[in-house]
Amino acid sequence: MNWDLRTNAEDGSQRMLNALLPGTVVPAHHHPHSSETVICLCGRMDEVCYDSNGHETERFHLCPADGAYGCQVPAGVWHSVEVFEPSVIFEAKDGAYGKDGSELM
């Protein structure tokens, strides 16, 4: 479930809260023209990065209770999440959802 934080549909950015449960599947994807800021507000999860062949290259542990609040996923990097406990994240990037050139792996 996500909550769009933009003030109107013409806003050219993506800012949202995203609630994720353990077992949530987010297909690996990338944003070719924008980096993505991910801030974990509660819960515990990993942001997982991949190369273009689908091999894991980096993993960011996100858990505010551990002092690990967020990460920056560079433009063009394939990524997904692994959720370990109910979590809420804030996500921000350039380009409106569905209109930013994002692609699934």
Residue ranges and their predicted role:
Residues 52-72:
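Extended, positively charged loop/linker patches that create polyanion-binding surfaces
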Residues 54-61, 78-105:
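Double-stranded beta-helix
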Residues 24, 33-34, 77, 85:
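A generic "binding-loop/recognition-motif" signal
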Residues 28-29, 47-49, 71-73, 79-84, ...:
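Short beta-strand His + acidic residue motifs that chelate non-heme Fe in jelly-roll/DSBH
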Residues 1-28, 34:
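A short glycine-rich, His/Asp/Glu-containing loop-to-beta-strand
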Residues 33-53:
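Glycine- and acidic-residue-biased ligand/ion/polar-headgroup-sensing regions
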Residues 17, 37, 80:
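Short, surface-exposed charged micro-motifs
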